[in-house]
């Protein structure tokens, strides 16, 4: 899901803390605690009245997109769909993010539809989620159904698609701006097409629309000899800061970023590199600060299941993937909650996330 609008009375400009870092990607050298800013002060520049010239006007007051954090009450949301979902081709970036015991599945079915019974169950679950949200008064929007089995080719690669099940991966809302992430998997290169109708509608209602530089996804973006066999291999590589994506060009998934008012936290992962983080930092500066954090995670990819900010100064931290910088949050007065380990085993998942 992707939250595009929250109640306007929330803590959309709140700052629980402020890092003073050294260079991007390095361990922070300082921490300064800041008090919460008021909603009015934080968003004054975001909600300026529209000028007569629409081509140069500020964001109108009735803009449908307005979300600054992960905890405000929800008004409107984009929920993905599993229809026509395809197994991604077994390329090196897919291999790096899947368990070895499932490699045979990807090798056999890559480029084909997922099993029908799997899709049927997934579609039913998503539809029920939409029904629950609607009953709670939330406006639900859905991406367009697309045939993801169609093969496409660029000067650098060819692939089939995957799905439009996870808008959180591809779209990031920062204030009144929607940012399309460039992605890092070749099978997700054209995934943005499923959301263009929705994004254009938000744009026509005042939202800012930004598309990050699209990577070529040439072979140079990936470590073709990335050594992965065991969990121990993954732990060792992650500890050394080695990932399947290189720094050949910027790439990132929106799901590696998490928002807390004017402070945005991000992890370097298998799909988000430092060039992508630096692009986002420069794009959002000076209004927002982007902080890199890291975890004891053998296969980092998407931050929500590892570290989630669920309220002002309130963090939900996965005990299996502790944050290396967690003491900085504690010193700044944040409350850190470590939930119990779930009873449901993780063995049923095709992905390492």
What are the roles of these predicted feature ranges?
Residues 31, 38-353:
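The feature marks the mature, well-folded catalytic cores of soluble enzymes
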Residues 1-48:
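N-terminal mitochondrial targeting presequence
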């Amino acid at each position: 899901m992707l939250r595009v609008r929250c109640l306007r009375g929330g803590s959309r400009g709140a700052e629980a803390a402020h890092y003073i870092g050294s260079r991007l990607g390095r361990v922070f050298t300082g921490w300064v605690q800041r008090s919460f800013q008021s909603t009015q002060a934080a968003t004054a520049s975001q909600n300026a009245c529209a000028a007569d010239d629409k081509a140069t006007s500020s964001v109108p007051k009735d803009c449908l997109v307005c979300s600054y954090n992960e905890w405000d009450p929800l008004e409107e949301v984009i929920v993905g769909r599993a229809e026509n979902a395809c197994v991604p081709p077994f390329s090196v970036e897919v291999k790096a993010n899947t368990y070895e015991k499932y490699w045979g599945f990807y090798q056999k079915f890559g480029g084909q539809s997922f099993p029908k019974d799997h899709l049927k169950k997934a579609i039913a679950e998503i539809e029920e989620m939409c029904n629950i949200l609607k009953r709670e008064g939330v406006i639900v929007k859905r991406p367009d159904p697309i045939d993801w089995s169609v093969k496409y080719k660029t000067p650098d690669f060819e692939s089939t698609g995957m799905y439009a099940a996870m808008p959180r991966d591809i779209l990031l809302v920062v204030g009144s701006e929607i940012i399309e992430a460039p992605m890092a998997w070749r099978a997700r290169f054209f995934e943005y097409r499923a959301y263009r109708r929705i994004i254009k509608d938000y744009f026509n209602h005042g939202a800012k629309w930004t598309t990050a530089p699209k990577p070529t996804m040439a072979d140079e973006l990936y470590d073709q000899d990335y050594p992965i066999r065991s969990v121990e291999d993954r732990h060792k590589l992650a500890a050394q800061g080695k990932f399947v994506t290189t720094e050949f060009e910027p790439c990132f998934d929106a799901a590696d970023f998490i928002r807390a008012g004017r402070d945005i936290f991000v992890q370097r992962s298998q799909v988000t590199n430092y060039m992508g983080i630096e692009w986002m930092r420069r794009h959002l500066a000076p209004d927002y600060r982007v902080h890199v954090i890291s975890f004891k995670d053998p296969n980092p990819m998407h931050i929500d299941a590892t570290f989630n900010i669920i309220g002002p100064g309130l963090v939900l931290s996965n005990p299996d993937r502790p944050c290396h910088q967690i003491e900085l949050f504690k010193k700044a007065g944040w409350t850190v909650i470590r939930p119990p380990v779930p009873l449901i085993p993780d063995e049923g998942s095709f992905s390492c996330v």
